[in-house]
């Protein structure tokens, strides 16, 4: 296994762990919350009828994350949405390890500042178990994508899964990573 420099992982080990141990009075270093994975989900409504659209968005998601996405399929038929069981309805990527830290670094420092009318992430989007979810309305904010090649603007949901027991611990962990939450 080759060594890869991951700036956020170094920051976590050298700065964030000691700060959280002091702030929450942890006795053991293993009690400190850490990132487990980042899941990026892109729901494609018309994709069930247009396989070219799924391929195009899969390539975009692969460029953004550096990992090939999985096609998610409908679990049951819903006639109102014209969906049958087994039809492709979206794409999903799960990032762990170095790719996860690099994606988070890119998200915090490059992508979120490029979002139009961005005033910070909603601090109330935690799920009660220390996980944070938010959505991006378009994929063009990622530097890997050329706006001329993108045919259809598509949003995505991003979920950051942590080992934190409470939302307060998870929020503090993400704040120390540099996540821009709304003040107030």
From Swiss-Prot:
Phosphoprotein among keywords:
no
Family annotation (InterPro entries): Ribosomal_uL5, Ribosomal_uL5_bac-type, Ribosomal_uL5_C, Ribosomal_uL5_CS, Ribosomal_uL5_dom_sf, Ribosomal_uL5_N
Q: Which GO terms describe its biological process?
A: translation
Q: Which molecular function terms from Gene Ontology are attached?
A: RNA binding; rRNA binding; structural constituent of ribosome; tRNA binding
Protein keywords: Ribonucleoprotein, Ribosomal protein, RNA-binding, rRNA-binding, tRNA-binding
Tagged with keyword RNA-binding: yes
State the superkingdom. Bacteria
Q: Which GO terms describe its cellular component?
A: cytosolic large ribosomal subunit
Q: Could you give the subunit structure recorded for this chain?
A: Part of the 50S ribosomal subunit; part of the 5S rRNA/L5/L18/L25 subcomplex. Contacts the 5S rRNA and the P site tRNA. Forms a bridge to the 30S subunit in the 70S ribosome.
Q: Provide the function of this protein.
A: This is one of the proteins that bind and probably mediate the attachment of the 5S RNA into the large ribosomal subunit, where it forms part of the central protuberance. In the 70S ribosome it contacts protein S13 of the 30S subunit (bridge B1b), connecting the 2 subunits; this bridge is implicated in subunit movement. Contacts the P site tRNA; the 5S rRNA and some of its associated proteins might help stabilize positioning of ribosome-bound tRNAs.
Protein name stated in the entry: Large ribosomal subunit protein uL5
């Amino acid at each position: 296994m080759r060594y890869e420099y991951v700036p956020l992982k170094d920051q976590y080990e050298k700065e964030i762990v000691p700060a959280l141990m002091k702030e929450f009075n942890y006795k053991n270093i293993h009690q400190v919350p850490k990132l487990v994975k980042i899941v990026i989900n892109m729901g494609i409504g018309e994709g069930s009828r247009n396989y070219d659209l799924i391929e195009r968005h899969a390539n975009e998601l692969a460029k953004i994350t550096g990992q090939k996405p999985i096609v998610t399929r409908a679990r049951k038929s819903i006639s109102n949405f014209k969906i049958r069981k087994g039809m492709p309805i979206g794409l999903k990527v799960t990032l762990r390890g170095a790719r996860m830290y690099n994606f988070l670094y890119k998200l915090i420092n490059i992508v979120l500042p490029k979002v139009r009318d961005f005033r910070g992430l909603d601090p109330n989007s935690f799920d009660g178990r220390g996980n944070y979810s938010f959505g991006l309305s378009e994929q063009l904010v990622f530097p890997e994508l050329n706006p001329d090649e993108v045919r259809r603007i598509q949003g995505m949901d991003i979920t950051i899964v942590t080992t934190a027991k409470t939302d307060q611990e998870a929020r503090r962990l993400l704040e120390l990573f540099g996540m821009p939450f709304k003040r107030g």
